[in-house]
From Swiss-Prot:
<feature type="domain" description="S4 RNA-binding">
    <location>
        <begin position="342"/>
        <end position="403"/>
    </location>
</feature>
<keyword id="KW-0694">RNA-binding</keyword>
<feature type="short sequence motif" description="'KMSKS' region">
    <location>
        <begin position="231"/>
        <end position="235"/>
    </location>
</feature>
<dbReference type="InterPro" id="IPR024088">
    <property type="entry name" value="Tyr-tRNA-ligase_bac-type"/>
</dbReference>
<dbReference type="InterPro" id="IPR002307">
    <property type="entry name" value="Tyr-tRNA-ligase"/>
</dbReference>
<comment type="function">
    <text>Catalyzes the attachment of tyrosine to tRNA(Tyr) in a two-step reaction: tyrosine is first activated by ATP to form Tyr-AMP and then transferred to the acceptor end of tRNA(Tyr).</text>
</comment>
<dbReference type="InterPro" id="IPR024108">
    <property type="entry name" value="Tyr-tRNA-ligase_bac_2"/>
</dbReference>
<dbReference type="InterPro" id="IPR036986">
    <property type="entry name" value="S4_RNA-bd_sf"/>
</dbReference>
<dbReference type="GO" id="GO:0005524">
    <property type="term" value="F:ATP binding"/>
</dbReference>
<keyword id="KW-0030">Aminoacyl-tRNA synthetase</keyword>
<feature type="short sequence motif" description="'HIGH' region">
    <location>
        <begin position="47"/>
        <end position="56"/>
    </location>
</feature>
<dbReference type="GO" id="GO:0004831">
    <property type="term" value="F:tyrosine-tRNA ligase activity"/>
</dbReference>
<keyword id="KW-0436">Ligase</keyword>
<dbReference type="InterPro" id="IPR002305">
    <property type="entry name" value="aa-tRNA-synth_Ic"/>
</dbReference>
<dbReference type="InterPro" id="IPR002942">
    <property type="entry name" value="S4_RNA-bd"/>
</dbReference>
<comment type="similarity">
    <text>Belongs to the class-I aminoacyl-tRNA synthetase family. TyrS type 2 subfamily.</text>
</comment>
<keyword id="KW-0067">ATP-binding</keyword>
C-alpha cells in the first residue's frame, strides 16, 4: 500500500466507530485507486421531517470526505421505507407517514444536503423507484433471506418480544428493504449511525444472497445534543437545525460545554485530526482559551451553512453580547422534574428569572423573553417535557433548563 492510500484510509477512519469487516477498507480504497473505479458510497435517509439537524450532518460530513477522495455518493431518500417507519430504538410500533407527508418532507432535503455534499459526485435516488416496483413473489424472495430468529437478535426487537409487546410484521420488513436498497444500487460501502449497524449488516447479507460483493459497513457515533447527554433530537429540543438563523446557530454552538466542543470538532469540523489534537493540547496547557477555539468552531459551521458574511456578522454580534455580559456561555444546566408540561411564565419564576408570573407575562408581551433565541410573546406558551431550553429574560438574564417527566 502506498502512503497515499494510507492517508486516505486514516482520513476515512477518523471519528468512525465500526469499519466492517475489519481490515478491508484500506484494501478496497487501494483497489479503487488501482482500477480507476470510484467506490459507490451509499447513504440513506428517510424523510420523516422537513428539516435536518446537525446530527444528520455527521454522516453527510463523512460522505463528503469520500467524495473529496474521488468516490461517488449514492444518496438514497427513503420515500418508500419512510411509509413503513424505522423501528430502530423504538419500544412501540412507529406511526407510518402518509405518501403526502413523505413527499413534502423529501422536497426540502436537496437544498439542505447540498450545503455539504458535492453535487457533481452525488446521485440522488428515491427507493420507491425499485421497492415500489417489487412483485409479491420478489418480496417473498427477499423475506426468505432472513429468519425471525435473526430479526430477534436486534436489541429493540428482542426487548419488545421479551416484554410481550407487539411487533408488527411490516417492522421486520424495514431492515430487509433497507438492505435491498444496497442490492438495487450495487453499493460498495454503506454509511450509518451506530444505531443502524444491524440494518447495514443485513444489506451485506442480501448482497451476498443476490450474488454481489458485500458492501463494507462504516458506522459513525450518534451526536449528542446541546445538553451533552442525550442524542441530538428535535423531540428532545436539544438540537441545532441546519436552517437555524446564523446568529441562533452561532449562539447555540457557543452554549455547549468545552468537553462537548471536542466531540463536535471530531464529528462536524473539517479541521484535520492533527490540528484538532494540537488545539486540545493548547487548551489543556492554557496556551489558548477554549472559548476562542469554540468561536472558531461556531464560525466554521455557520460559514458552511450560511456563508462567510453571515458567519462574520454572527461572530461580531456574539462578541458584542459577551462584552456586555449578555452571553449564555457556560451556564449550568438545571434539571427540573415536573408532572406536566409547564407554562413558560411559571417556569421563569421557578428558575428565578422573574419575580412573579404577572411580571413574566408582562415581559413576554413586551418581547423581552426568548426561548432558544426565539422571541416568545404569547403568555399562554407551554413548553414540552423531555427537552432542553435556553431561557432569556430581558437582555442579561439567562438560564439553561432540562425539563424531565417526574413527580
Amino acid at each position: 500500500m502506498t502512503m497515499k492510500h494510507q492517508d486516505a484510509f486514516e482520513q476515512i477512519a477518523f471519528g468512525t466507530v465500526d469499519m466492517l469487516p475489519e481490515g478491508e477498507m484500506l484494501a478496497r480504497l487501494a483497489a479503487a485507486q488501482r482500477d480507476n473505479r470510484p467506490l459507490r458510497i451509499k447513504l440513506g435517509m428517510d424523510p420523516t421531517a422537513p428539516d435536518l439537524h446537525l446530527g444528520a450532518y455527521v454522516l453527510l460530513h463523512k460522505a463528503r470526505q469520500f467524495q473529496d477522495l474521488g468516490h461517488r455518493l449514492l444518496f438514497v431518500i427513503g420515500d418508500f421505507t419512510a411509509m413503513i417507519g424505522d423501528p430502530t430504538g423504538k419500544s412501540v410500533t412507529r406511526k407510518a407517514l402518509s405518501r403526502e407527508e413523505v413527499v413534502a418532507n423529501a422536497a426540502t432535503y436537496r437544498p439542505q444536503v447540498f450545503k455539504i455534499l458535492d453535487p457533481e459526485r452525488t446521485e440522488v435516488m428515491f427507493n420507491s423507484e425499485w421497492l415500489g416496483a417489487l412483485r409479491p413473489e420478489e418480496l417473498i424472495q427477499i423475506a426468505a433471506c432472513y429468519t425471525v430468529a435473526r430479526m430477534l437478535e436486534r436489541d429493540d426487537f428482542n426487548k419488545r418480544y421479551s416484554a410481550n409487546q407487539p411487533i408488527a410484521i411490516h417492522e421486520f420488513l424495514y431492515p430487509l428493504l433497507q438492505g435491498y436498497d444496497s442490492v438495487a444500487i450495487k453499493a460498495d460501502v454503506e454509511l450509518g449511525g451506530t444505531d443502524q449497524r444491524f440494518n447495514l449488516l443485513v444489506g451485506r447479507e442480501l448482497q451476498r444472497e443476490y450474488g454481489q460483493k458485500p458492501q463494507l459497513v462504516l458506522t459513525m457515533p450518534i451526536l449528542e445534543g446541546l445538553d451533552g447527554v442525550q442524542k441530538m433530537s428535535k423531540s428532545l429540543g436539544n438540537f441545532i437545525a441546519v436552517e437555524d438563523p446564523p446568529a441562533e446557530m452561532f449562539g447555540k454552538i457557543m452554549s455547549i460545554s468545552d468537553f462537548l466542543m471536542w466531540r463536535y470538532y471530531a464529528l462536524l469540523s473539517r479541521v484535520p485530526a492533527v490540528e484538532q489534537t494540537r488545539l486540545q493540547k493548547e487548551a489543556a496547557s492554557g496556551a489558548r482559551n477554549p472559548r476562542d477555539i469554540k468561536l472558531d468552531l461556531a464560525g466554521e459551521l455557520v460559514r458552511r451553512f450560511h456563508g462567510t458574511a453571515a458567519a462574520q456578522e454572527a461572530h461580531i454580534a456574539f462578541l458584542a453580547r459577551f462584552q456586555r455580559h449578555e452571553t449564555p456561555e457556560d451556564l449550568p444546566l438545571q434539571a427540573i422534574k415536573l408532572s406536566e408540561a409547564p407554562r413558560l411564565s411559571q417556569l421563569l419564576v421557578q428558575v428565578h428569572l422573574a419575580a412573579s408570573t404577572s411580571e413574566a407575562m408582562r415581559k413576554m408581551k413586551e418581547g423581552a423573553v426568548r426561548v432558544d433565541w426565539r422571541r416568545v410573546v404569547d403568555p399562554a406558551t407551554i413548553l414540552a417535557l423531555d427537552a432542553v431550553y435556553l431561557l432569556q429574560f430581558g437582555k442579561r438574564h439567562f438560564a439553561r433548563v432540562a425539563l424531565q417527566k417526574g413527580e
